[in-house]
């Protein structure tokens, strides 16, 4: 089944805010994520909650989509320890359909074919960006939940395989150099 993202999720832009040295809410920015869309390091709260509306606070399972610049990626918000809001670099995608896993949606948005499709529709010259309308109209292929879980499982195994191959190569290099 294929559905438009705008029909299965609420999409809102991230928040523009000025950082403080100390705060009680984390202001998530694209620089906090590595190439695979994973958080790089522990985050420091740098926004004051008195100035943030509740609707901007991220909820577990929200999908963040970095829509500005040349590096577009999707990541699922999992942080349960600290309150966070997304910066304007992101669209926050909150699923309203229960038949799609947030992790599957992030995988789908990160898939090379989807990335190419989105890049072809990006606007701007010096700072390219993907518009909310483009995201809303993006057709998402939605298999059943079991298939979604299988896709995610195979993807995790593939990532582990890549990591193990890299470790093996590093150990080989070390062994050759130490002889």
Language-model features: locations:
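Sequence-specific dsDNA recognition surfaces
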Residues: 4-17, 31-60
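A short beta-sheet element
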Residues: 67-108
């Amino acid at each position: 089944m294929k559905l438009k993202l705008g029909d299965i999720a609420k999409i809102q832009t991230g928040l523009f805010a000025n950082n403080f040295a100390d705060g009680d809410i984390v202001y998530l920015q694209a620089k906090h994520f590595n190439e695979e869309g994973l958080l790089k390091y522990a985050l420091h709260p740098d926004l004051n909650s008195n100035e943030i509306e509740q609707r901007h606070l991220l909820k577990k399972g929200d999908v963040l989509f970095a829509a500005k610049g040349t590096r577009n990626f999707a990541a699922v918000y999992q942080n349960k320890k600290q309150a966070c809001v997304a910066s304007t670099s992101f669209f926050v995608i909150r699923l309203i359909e229960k038949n799609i896993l947030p992790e599957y949606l992030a995988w789908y948005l990160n898939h090379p074919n989807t990335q190419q499709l989105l890049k072809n529709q990006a606007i701007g010259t010096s700072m390219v960006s993907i518009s909310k309308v483009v995201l809303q109209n993006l057709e998402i292929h939605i298999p059943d939940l079991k298939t979604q879980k299988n896709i995610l499982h195979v993807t995790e195994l593939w990532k582990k395989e890549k990591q193990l191959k890299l470790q093996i190569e590093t150990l080989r290099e070390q062994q050759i150099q130490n002889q």
